[in-house]
Amino acid sequence: MRPEGAGMELGGGEERLPEESRREHWQLLGNLKTTVEGLVSTNSPNVWSKYGGLERLCRDMQSILYHGLIRDQACRRQTDYWQFVKDIRWLSPHSALHVEKFISVHENDQSSADGASERAVAELWLQHSLQYHCLSAQLRPLLGDRQYIRKFYTDAAFLLSDAHVTAMLQCLEAVEQNNPRLLAQIDASMFARKHESPLLVTKSQSLTALPSSTYTPPNSYAQHSYFGSFSSLHQSVPNNGSERRSTSFPLSGPPRKPQESRGHVSPAEDQTIQAPPVSVSALARDSPLTPNEMSSSTLTSPIEASWVSSQNDSPGDASEGPEYLAIGNLDPRGRTASCQSHSSNAESSSSNLFSSSSSQKPDSAASSLGDQEGGGESQLSSVLRRSSFSEGQTLTVTSGAKKSHIRSHSDTSIASRGAPESCNDKAKLRGPLPYSGQSSEVSTPSSLYMEYEGGRYLCSGEGMFRRPSEGQSLISYLSEQDFGSCADLEKENAHFSISESLIAAIELMKCNMMSQCLEEEEVEEEDSDREIQELKQKIRLRRQQIRTKNLLPMYQEAEHGSFRVTSSSSQFSSRDSAQLSDSGSADEVDEFEIQDADIRRNTASSSKSFVSSQSFSHCFLHSTSAEAVAMGLLKQFEGMQLPAASELEWLVPEHDAPQKLLPIPDSLPISPDDGQHADIYKLRIRVRGNLEWAPPRPQIIFNVHPAPTRKIAVAKQNYRCAGCGIRTDPDYIKRLRYCEYLGKYFCQCCHENAQMAIPSRVLRKWDFSKYYVSNFSKDLLIKIWNDPLFNVQDINSALYRKVKLLNQVRLLRVQLCHMKNMFKTCRLAKELLDSFDTVPGHLTEDLHLYSLNDLTATRKGELGPRLAELTRAGATHVERCMLCQAKGFICEFCQNEDDIIFPFELHKCRTCEECKACYHKACFKSGSCPRCERLQARREALARQSLESYLSDYEEEPAEALALEAAVLEAT
């Protein structure tokens, strides 16, 4: 009988566990290892950059820490692991730095009446420890004392299985060190589903001296920024027909008492418990960490009560695979644990932290206030949208439900950046923070941006376009987006998003004006006084003339201003404005004269708008990007009332154009750098397109395209732009532009009439004229400008005969090739070899490879003189170097020993292509090389000798056999 507190021994008590407990241990460890493999197998410098990675790992660790907790018989509920964790202050004070911060929060919170607050603080501590890579260092002292563990856990708990605990810590170390090789040290048989779980055998240190292990936080915490840590914690991309677990913040209401758990199931998986408020301001007040040390989002992330996966699932469903890690699904089978949240205090919404800059729709806050007050189940229908996070909005609760649809973008990790505030009011933490684990059909990301004690903490949905706040203008909404930090794919999607915003705004204005016209017509029909109608008509015409005069100077100023609209853009004329306002009334004119919402706030806020903001550079205002075009267009309507950004409805709903993130490939148990195809894994390729259109691929084209027929070529492209895939009506195909390099038609956004030399025309016709190419082709040709990709001998060998300059360069390259081979074996030619390296290597090593830069330099006459200078320097060295003189040839025909010839002397030397021997051109008159004839005669003589020896051996064998047989007969 071994003492319980004598340290951890491998396999202790494992053989006495029932089959059900071993299966649960296997399932928990398998889920953890699958998640860790998905995090560390991508060679990303930040393991939390993977979409939904931190959320899934938190869920797996919650399942392990909840497994086997002893139930509280007095309160008839399961205790939380916070009591188990917080005693690390006494077991290992050096490792309790992070725990003490959360202990102070729990002790200062006076509103807690049950264990739900402990659960919230424990889950916050778990998220914080995983984010800062210090969870294993904190768990080691706790797991080293088995007697202490038995105070909180049953004998069948996961933490009392030494083999599984060792594997768990190994997985945590792999994440903390971002080293997938540590996973290979775990015995693979540990995860095999057998009747008896084998003992764990690792190739590294075990847990023998755990009680004495200490943890010292590194000093580099203040310098590290963990992008994508909490930002992806509560995100999930909407998927049609799928239900997902999520977390939402109820704005108010007392905590509900939990239901009794059924069987051996953790509380986080069987029920949803709403925690009482936890004061985060107390944490900021008592915590010794600076805002930098707390990183971007330390304690502002909500708690999700459904992290722990169900232990009653079949073992076949235990491994969800890393593909769900990529798309953010907490449960691919769509299980939900419905609960109802009651709200009794709708007035307390001002003290909560719902931000208008979060990725949640405004109606979700309203549903928490209104729908939950009636006791019904709140069903949120918010749809997420990707964007850079905006830091400039005041944290206010928005009410009023608006039905709109927004697109979800492709998976792109965007690090949120700080930006100047657009308002004078700073976001303050004005009340306690209620935590609740709540299930709904769509996840609620709950992005928060808080500022307390001078420190900013950002917890935004990473790469998510936030929803505009109530009444926020389009100019303010578009100007605050950080498009400069977006990836290329995100910028492409932003192009469509901003275009849809402008189109939706214009259509909304038209709709409002048409409705006003109809109302006025109805009023006029009721009004029978003809004199009043004539008077109203005169007033409308007069106001129309005044408005037209006011618009003309504004557009003249725009033509001479910093922002200019391209010729392809549609110009707004006075006739158009007259048509728009022809049926306006006095109220209508007054509405159009109202200033924009942000412009009329105050001078301080207007000075921070897009036009005058110092955060946007001067070159950005002059650029032709989508956001610059949008802002320039909106700037012309500053004096008029524009619809708020929150009032827009997207033209293409989500159900009409469903999009979701592409699943990542299966995780690798080892580092891709060590695999057989490591070079392939390093390439991050995202294949895009559909059955009708695919984006152009980088390809080298050697053939000249035939003269295109626009109607036939566009029909082959399915009337879509070859660059962006936008559909064009057959009546407008004349607006498409032809790319001479790819031989396809592009829209005006993807083809800006850039001109480049076409490689196929250079190689076929020696034509260096510049032709119109698309933006994609231009970028491709610029990238390959210096790459030796064109073999003139294989593509068009007749070009040497047609172009004298090219043939001269070819002869010089032949001489340099022979010289360089000779100088490589001469110890006195090191400086000369360095001068040879000043030109690209293919010019002196491969005779017929050219780049576009080489061909252009040849045509201009610049390449020939450079190569001729190197040739003269090499010939001078050979004349003076005795080592190189010894490598020369003596002509076999004239046998002139005074005239040593070399292969690079093309004017007097002829080199045999077979044996590389050199002769004088005047002496070499016969058709064959004498050295080749000697070598051939020698080979034939050797062949005859080998054949004769083989035949002689074959004839001797029968004679020896007959003599042996005669000797045997004589002996008998």
From Swiss-Prot:
Domain RUN: 48-189
Substitution effect: residue 915 to G: Disrupts interaction with Rab7, translocation to cytoplasm
Amino acid composition bias (Polar residues), ranges on this chain: 378-401, 436-446
Signal peptide positions on this chain: none
Alphabetized PROSITE patterns for the sequence: RUN
A Pfam family: RUN
Residue ranges, annotated region (Interaction with Rab7): 721-972
MF GO annotations: phosphatidylinositol 3-kinase inhibitor activity; phosphatidylinositol phosphate binding
Composition skew (Basic and acidic residues), residue ranges: 13-22
Residue numbers spanned by region Interaction with PIK3C3: 49-180
Region (Disordered): 1-22, 233-279, 307-446, 562-589
Region annotation Interaction with YWHAB: where it falls in the sequence: 204-447
GO CC, one annotated term: late endosome
Keywords: Autophagy, Endocytosis, Endosome, Immunity, Lysosome, Neurodegeneration, Phagocytosis, Phosphoprotein
Phosphoserine carried by residues: 197, 248, 266, 388, 410, 528, 562, 671
Stretches for region Interaction with BECN1: 505-557
Residues covered by region (Interaction with UVRAG): 300-600
Biased composition regions of type Low complexity, renumbered to the chain: 338-368, 563-581
Main location: other
Chain intervals for the UniProt region annotation (Interaction with CARD9): 672-760
Gene Ontology BP, a term: negative regulation of autophagy
Subunit record text: Associates with PI3K (PI3KC3/PI3K-III/class III phosphatidylinositol 3-kinase) complex II (PI3KC3-C2) in which the core composed of the catalytic subunit PIK3C3, the regulatory subunit PIK3R4 and BECN1 is associated with UVRAG; in the complex interacts directly with PI3KC3 and UVRAG. Interacts with Rab7 (RAB7A or RAB7B) (GTP-bound form); Rab7 and UVRAG compete for RUBCN binding; can interact simultaneously with Rab7 and the PI3K complex. Interacts with CYBA and CYBB; indicative for the association with the CYBA:CYBB NADPH oxidase heterodimer.
Function of the protein: Inhibits PIK3C3 activity; under basal conditions negatively regulates PI3K complex II (PI3KC3-C2) function in autophagy. Negatively regulates endosome maturation and degradative endocytic trafficking and impairs autophagosome maturation process. Can sequester UVRAG from association with a class C Vps complex (possibly the HOPS complex) and negatively regulates Rab7 activation. Involved in regulation of pathogen-specific host defense of activated macrophages. Following bacterial infection promotes NADH oxidase activity by association with CYBA thereby affecting TLR2 signaling and probably other TLR-NOX pathways. Stabilizes the CYBA:CYBB NADPH oxidase heterodimer, increases its association with TLR2 and its phagosome trafficking to induce antimicrobial burst of ROS and production of inflammatory cytokines.
Protein name: Run domain Beclin-1-interacting and cysteine-rich domain-containing protein
Lineage, broadest ranks: Eukaryota, Metazoa, Chordata, Craniata, Vertebrata
